[in-house]
């Protein structure tokens, strides 16, 4: 009998396809589809470690979107974009700017005669490389422990994608129980999705809007009360259920007493000019204010109290950056240089800090050649997107489909072991698309789910060391079939250490 040959595919030649557990069972075109789809997929909030891993997930996890320390540096100052004091109650993570001295350049070395160099690294709260889809950064312990005077090595990760877990594994999707069947809904690459699975697979969307107002129209008090005038939601707060973020009202002579009553200013009417977010359950994540007075303030007193608070917070942020720069200048005189990012930040700060009194040079803020209104507020908000009809799903084998229906959990098929189907798809497409490895993954995952259930039930009934060893050896026999190399690795482990842990 001929001996079977084992061919090893080199990960360096497979590139992204090395994340596929069964690349030998996928046609070239389908493998290429997986490579393109994984770059288009947004991070899933319920992401999981893949059940059948290739060993390359952690390596790819090193190159996902991250905020890293660019050089070996010593922290000079940590500046939060919004300070902790004040009257605004911010209930959300806030951006942070870290000022550091580059210890690989100039003043960081006795042998290097170049001047000391200082730079900044900005830790944002979210990443948005798409006009809608993005994710909230997860700050690492290194970021949470930043303080003046400590040294940070180059490439220290300060914030990472939520797709990376604490072990460094790249979780680019979510495991699913897939049923291949001849349901009428799954024709033409249709997919039926379990509602509970969809709810656990949400991803982040973002929206932006710019609001402007001055004395011609008054901003409404849509988020305040009789004592607090609040014209838009604060950072971390949800947008109203009707989606109105901000609205202004044009005053009509003779109707001022009606239009400007406390109750009227807290009510949005169809005749008002409103900025509306179409997405549900949206939450504000960023507010940026530009104040461009054209002489005497035109907005009625008190109606601009909220944007003035944000303006003051912005000025405090830039004042602290300027203070850090002044401290560097006092220590080093003129014998230092700034990174382009730090230089640009200071210039932007001067624009925000300049006074607008009569004895100072005025700055004119324009957009597309036209002067801005007295107040301009840029609001960024985030919201959860739940997969639903019209969304596209894909797997590691180039298998894909469009959701045509979402069924309640109790309507989905259940197998003899009580496993509920998460996704229903057409099995015939596997033959048509030449990606039979889809069935490999489904069958092996189902087999090991049953194996796991059997082992757990057996150990519950008999927790002796003898039975534990028996179940361990039985599991090794399954590994011998699926991955002999992995089985050899597991055999080197003392199974009884698991009992102690």
Regions found by a protein language model. Give the residues of each.
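Long, charge-dense accessory insertions within large macromolecular proteins
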Residues: 1-387, 392, 497-501
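Flexible glycine/proline-rich, aromatic-decorated loop/lid segments
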Residues: 125-129, 403-420
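Helical mechanochemical/support elements of P-loop NTPase systems and associated helical scaffolds
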Residues: 151, 238, 280, 386-389, ...
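Intein-associated homing endonuclease modules of the LAGLIDADG/DOD-type, together
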Residues: 176, 185, 192, 197, ...
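Conserved nucleotide-binding/hydrolysis micro-motifs of P-loop NTPases
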Residues: 184-186, 252, 291, 399-400, ...
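Short, well-ordered loop/turn and helix-capping segments at boundaries between secondary-structure elements
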Residues: 251, 409, 445-449
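Single-stranded RNA-binding surfaces
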Residues: 379, 390-392, 400, 404, ...
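Long C-terminal interaction/binding lobes of large macromolecular proteins
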Residues: 440-501
